[in-house]
Amino acid sequence: MESIRVPKQWDSRKRFDFLLMDLDFSSSPGYPYLKEAPTIGQWLGADETGEFNQQRVEKLWFDVQRVLAGDYPHLFRVFIKDEPHKIAKAETNRWRMIVASSLPVQMVWRMLFNEQNLALNKNSARIPSKHGFIQCYGGWMTFLADLQSKGIKYSRDISGWDVGAPGFIFKIIGKLRQRWPGVSDSWIAAQRLVYDDAYENSNLIFSNGVVVRQLFGGFMKSGLFSTIADNSLAMVGIHILAALRSGMPYGHFAATGDDVVQSHVTEEYLQELGRLGCRVKEVLPRIEFMGINYSSQRPEPIYTAKHLANLMMKTCDLGDLFDAYGRLYGESRLFPCWAQLAAYMGVQMRSQDYYRFWYSNPWAATMVDWHL
């Protein structure tokens, strides 16, 4: 596996300044920074030239040092995600919760795990964790052919993974990360600190001001820098353990977050998954992965109703939104419906051939400007 070493000066000011540019400026800065500004970009005073308010940068650097010293009173902010929910979930108050860390903690996670997560992304074709998989430029065809050549034909739907995620698997992932090339004693100490904060002794603040303490190990926080990476590694580890305990062959397996596809499934294996904290709602005899159904040998988006609901709620530019859906539905039988809907709303989408070329042709990767 291609390795990207953890830098010797992983906790330096120079590295901190460099990684500031990788932040999502539209995301929340978490508690308590959100009291001063609703987004990271606004809190940092970011302008169009990439400059920041230096007083804010110095404050953030000071708080990063407090995190590394174990002297930062961190509260995860818990809120309901502003997105469409299924009626059945709404009626039973099963809302999609976001558990977001404070900006100084986000920065420490970036400083610790940036190279590791980047390596996992770059090597997704060779490892079970597939969060670096790129669907466009024909990537979906390579991915589907790889799964089929390995006999992968089952998908499983997991219920309540975030809250039910067991603590032991994150201890294993922590040990795995500690074996990475370039890791130092100071790095390991900081890794243990942030994993304890995230997976063992978390403090969470709700929108009404109530603060609670987590009294059990586990519980994946949806707003971590490594949420997808750690979830993917967790799925791999639990699969191996359940296969060992049930006597089922490991077979072939792929995971992105809690999305899983695999070549083997037995009743005993599913029972072991349940004992390990992974509650399987159903097993599907087809490949559904990362919101795409591949049953027709073409990528068909699964969450069309959610996409339509998003269209009614979004305040962004409709042209950009329909362009994004044009790419997502580029190979779909539903593309003409989206084109008609766009025209009805006064937006002229490009042709399906245009989007199909972008989605499925490797030559598309050589194009510099896709708006020509």
What does each model-found stretch correspond to?
Residues M1-L372:
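Viral RNA-dependent RNA polymerase
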